[in-house]
Amino acid sequence: MDKREYIRRLAEFLMSTGTSMNVQELAGLLNWNGFKTNYDSPFKGGRGTYTLIHATYDWLVSSGKTTDADNVALAFKKPNGTYAYK
């Protein structure tokens, strides 16, 4: 499973349970599952993590999977509570 698919599935689970996750928690899960940034470094909950969320959202929209894209948009949040996909 690639990073985008992992994000999609995690977002689906979060939405099914009525919860969300902040970017730092997501970075920890990505690292724990062995995923790396495009620069082959661990995720830190910064720019690389936000880029992955946004890229996953765009990939799902372009694939016509709008429900999945909406899940990604709503599931992951910045520390201030705003949505991380923007």
Predicted feature residues:
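Positively charged, polyanion-binding regions of nucleic-acid-associated proteins
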Residues: 2-21
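Short, charged amphipathic recognition helices of the HTH superfamily
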Residues: 15-32, 36
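Residue-level detector of family-conserved "landmark" positions at structurally sensitive sites
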Residues: 24, 40, 70-71
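Phospho-regulated, low-complexity intrinsically disordered regions of nuclear gene-regulatory
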Residues: 63-86
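Short, positively charged loop/turn segments that connect secondary-structure elements
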Residues: 31-67
